Every structure is written in C-alpha cells, then in structure tokens.
Amino acid sequence: MISNYEPLLLLVITCCVLLFNFTISSKTKIDIIFAVQTIVFIWFIFHFVHSAI
C-alpha cells in the first residue's frame, strides 16, 4: 500500500543520495556500500533461519 508521504520520502532520499554522491570520497562510498550490504545480508539470514525453524 502506498501512502501519501512515500513519493515525497523517496524524492528526499534520492536528492540526499545525489548530493552525497558528489560530496563524499570513493573510499567512503565503498565503506557505506559494504556496511549496507552487510546489514541486509544479516537481516536476510536472520529471517531465513527463523522461517526455517
């Protein structure tokens, strides 16, 4: 279900990402991507294990 605020929220997130893309260094970008992928992987494993039990 799409709420009324979601398009605005997605627009704000997109603008922030574009702003940060030009302001932060490549090493910081790689560190952020690695951290996000790690969090998503841990979340996936957590839910997979709990659905299998």
UniProtKB/Swiss-Prot annotation:
UniProt entry tagged with the keyword Membrane: yes
Induction / repression: Expressed in the late phase of the viral replicative cycle.
Membrane topology: Multi-pass membrane protein
Pfam families, A to Z: DUF1029
Superkingdom of this protein's organism: Viruses
Keyword set includes Ion transport: no
Keywords annotated in UniProt: ATP-binding, DNA-binding, Helicase, Hydrolase, Late protein, Membrane, Nucleotide-binding, Phosphoprotein, Transcription, Transcription regulation, Transcription termination, Transmembrane, Transmembrane helix, Viral envelope protein, Virion
Protein modification: Not phosphorylated.
Transmembrane region(s): 5-25, 30-50
A molecular-function term among this protein's GO annotations: hydrolase activity
Virion surface side, ranges: 26-29
GO BP, sorted A to Z: DNA-templated transcription termination
Record-level GO cellular component terms: membrane; viral envelope; virion membrane
Main location: virion
Side Intravirion, residues: 1-4, 51-53
Localization terms from the record: Virion membrane
Described function: Protein probably involved in counteracting host defense, since it enhances virulence in vivo.
Membership in a protein family: Belongs to the orthopoxvirus OPG141 protein family.
Name assigned to this protein: Virion membrane protein OPG141
Species annotation: Vaccinia virus (strain Western Reserve)
